[in-house]
Amino acid sequence: MEYLAVSTDNRLISPSISPAFITPPHPAAPVGKAKLLNEHSRHEIDHWVTKFPPGRHRSACITALRAAQHQNDGHLTQDLLEAVAEYLNLPPIQVYEVAAFYSMFELHPCGRHHVSVCTNISCMLNGSDKIVEYVEKKLGIKTGESTPDGRIFLKREEECLAACTGAPMMMVDEVFHEWLTSEKIDKVLDELK
């Protein structure tokens, strides 16, 4: 097989793969609401679009929403949802459905740092209910709330964060903290600025 191109992640591309594979599904310069996405977000989205087959740019929706949420201090607005839809050339309802379905996305303003305590079976059997109580007491808030200073958002119950062997565990800004104790929790939360 003869290879004619190299993708952005240095994979060889066969001539049978259309150039759309390495070209984002949007114009070079964003127009309309897509302008709301900053350059870093657009670069991140473009990077992920190239990883999917031609015409499958919808598959990059989750990473596009993550980039948009990150640029907006941890939550998505209606305008950002529409910007992602326009940038990926998708119907806005498809983007909204993804954002509303996954617990990693917040559709309302919240604290800068996102804290998720896993409460699924492995964590529950290892005391996640006590972990949630401890974190709520330490922060002075309930799940689904942010600290008054806007520093920390304690997400609602998380069914599984896929780290069962490290139960009980929590995720803070996409970083796992396993085998939790009150001392570990204090250290992690106190280091958040």
Model segments located where?
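Signature of N-terminal electron-transfer/Fe-S-associated modules in redox systems
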Residues: 2-193
